[in-house]
Amino acid sequence: MSRDDLARLEEACVKAWDQHDADGFASLLTEDCVVIDDMEPKPLRSRDAARRYAESWFTAFPDMRVQEKNRVIGDDGMAVELELKGTNTGPLEMGGTRLAPTGRRITAGVNVFMKARGGRIREIHSHSDSLSMMSQLGLAGSSAPA
């Protein structure tokens, strides 16, 4: 894939998340994709598991917006810095635990690294500022303003 193709793939991924389009997100992935998220107990190892993962975030934060802050496109992958903003009004699936909605608003940074194969994303590594997110939700330490 060219760097322009990779850039378009990354843009489509961010757009799918911003528009809460779990099926659109899943369509960008290889069937055997792997999603590794710091807040998940183990890697997700299929397109369907990745779709369910996205749906869980859209349920937890139905007003969530995703904005790209920075990106780097390489020969076979992309790195993107994102900012997530939303209100936790639905149950949050995190680390194998289901957390009740807090009603609190968050602003959180997420760094995502993606590898591509054959025009689709084959691997995603997501690293979020989980301490800040949990604090803003009132679930860890002092609560920072959103």
Task: Annotate each language-model stretch with its function.
Residues 1-146:
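C-terminal and inter-domain tail/linker signature
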